[in-house]
Amino acid sequence: MKCICRLSECIGKWLKVSVMRRLFVWFVISVAALTSCGNKSNKLRDVDPRVESLLNEMTLDEKIGQMVLFTSDWDVTGPTMYEGYLEDIRNGRCGNIFNAYTTDYIRELQRVAVEESRLGIPLLFGYDVVHGHKTIFPVPLAESCSWDMELIRQSAGVAAAEAAASGLNWTFAPMVDISVDPRWGRVCEGAGEDPYLGSQIAAARVKGFQGNDLADTLSVLACVKHFAGYGAPIAGRDYNTVDMSERMFRDVYLPPYKAGVDAGALSVMTSFNEYDGVPATGNSYLLKDILKNQWKYQGFVVTDYTSINEMVHHGVVPDEAEASVLAVNAGVDMDLQGVVYFNYLKTMVESGKVSTRTIDEAVLRILNVKSRLGLFDNPYLYCDKEREQSIVGSMQNMQVAREVARKSMVLLKNDEVLPLKKGERIAVIGELASSKRDLLGSWKAAGEWDDMKSVLEALVAYNGASNVVYAEGCKKMGDDRSGFLSALLAAQSADKVVMVIGEDWDWSGEAASRTDLGVPGVQSDLLELVAATGKPVVVVLLNGRPLTIERESQVADAILEAWYPGSRGAEAVVDVLYGEYNPSGKLTMTFPRNVGQVPIYYYEKNTGRPIYLPNEKYKSKYLDSPNTPLYPFGYGLSYTTFEYSDLKLSSPGLKKGKSIVASVTVTNTGARYGEEIVQLYIRDLVGSVTRPVKMLKGFQKVALSPGESVQVSFVITEDMLSFWRKDMTFGAEPGDFHVMIGRSSDDTLQASFNLSRK
């Protein structure tokens, strides 16, 4: 070490550039670490020895600084709690920043951290890149309806490349919360109601964001959120209490988080809700027992916005000081914008309520992730102006967004009206038809709409201005009917009507819960009048959740669920309406008939009084509505038709540790090329605890020309039959099973097999 110190003095005489000084410090730390890292022991694998050595050089204030995440004044996604972040970066008391982007701005903040703080530890820069950065893709719920894992991975990869090119190295995504309640506004950010599909998508998005190498400048750190159970608030009201059985929690809600962690995610965000009476941000059962111990999670845990502070309101701690103790001892490594760790954690350590070992473990996790991102080798790795100008919002990325949007749309109804014919006179009605902003949905990141087309503009561009007449008709909100007459006149002058209706973008997302799931305002009243003209009416829905559209489905001739389709969503809508692309999307959330059916999902239990005959009275049913949804999970139409036949099993019995194969023939019986999502469901007929009527266990997407057939096969293993049993062990139970393969959760062929004890 004496030689190293003398070498430092000599080289220091000619090191004039601050960045070089910092790099040299890291060189010294690296050499020193080679002699000391073997004496350390911790639960993490593959810890950078420089990180362990650096930890020994840090003061308590500097350690706590690494556990602090403050917002910049660049963009705000919540109430600003603290504004002196620049001085705190200099003092080593803030190690992470969010809501900042562009290479110029981030380079300057990074310069302050690296060149003006004592140890020069680089900053993490996070942002809500939820469904794109500059190029905005369809909202995640829409993307999930593509059932296309490679496409979803690709869209996350494009988002990561653009974010990284803008200086960012961390996204607060993916949201993997399962939800069966469309009243909850944040369903638009997730993958729907199914744990198997949700797990596949969670893994695909993590891999898309993080790529093959976190230090690759086309990748960013993913953040699996919101851990855990955030998608199940009572009454669908955001931030509300979550109360469910441990079995339901483990069977349905936990799997996507586990899939994200297994895919390599190195940050996990806590949720606002409580679980089993304890807020998730202070819940050691979730954060330590499950995440860090059972799952061997290698990354760090960050809170959601001020959720440590909010534990005071939950009533589990008397003040924010005690909240800091509860959070850090439960396993929270980083405080997002709460200023609680910043204000109180040092005092709590000095008082003995928090151990230095707890602090060290948290800081070690954070610093190790920074190392994995390559920030210790090059703090400005993500600050390349040339890359920013060439990648962000490129034509190539926009084309990917258009492809994702086309594959995410779901054709809900079509009475031989679609596809439209070019040259027909089209009346376009609805305020949403002329809106660009609404196409982006919530969490638009750096997305802009100035260079986008509205659905109206895209229709004019494709069909010609002389063949399109527009009337707003009514606003998307409110009860003004003064434009109805002009809309009816426009409809009467046209061959067909395209009516664009749905939700304002701000009515979906965080803090956007609803008690009425109908189309807002008087849009549906206008639709009924337009349909009464006798002209064929095509409804295009722009929304972020399943809506109750039974009324609309009765009067419209065709309904296309376009969701919030993103930067090139308008062009994608036109592609589908005119048959340039044959729709193939399938619903990943059930569409209820009315809000009284909510929560509603396909994997319900049979109950002791299932319905066998429609008029039976003392059964589990409603007096005023069928139990069945309007549109079930897995449903979606095409411009062609597919026939399922010849379901076969390779064996009627499945032995433990072995597998059987289920196969079905799918034939394109229509006149167009099309893609079909073939779905596999399994039912466990008798269990030690009650089991769902079916659960999705596999799917495949096939592409067929007219008249073409293909045999689709699924391998069924014992693992696919496993669940949390009566004694809360995980595994399969011997017995009889139904296997169902088909085009949706309620339209399948069925066969049976038996799982033996041996």
What function would you assign to each model-found segment?
Residues 33-723, 731-745, 757:
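Glycoside hydrolase catalytic-domain context in secreted enzymes
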Residues 747-751:
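Extracellular and select intracellular beta-sandwich modules with Ser/Thr-enriched
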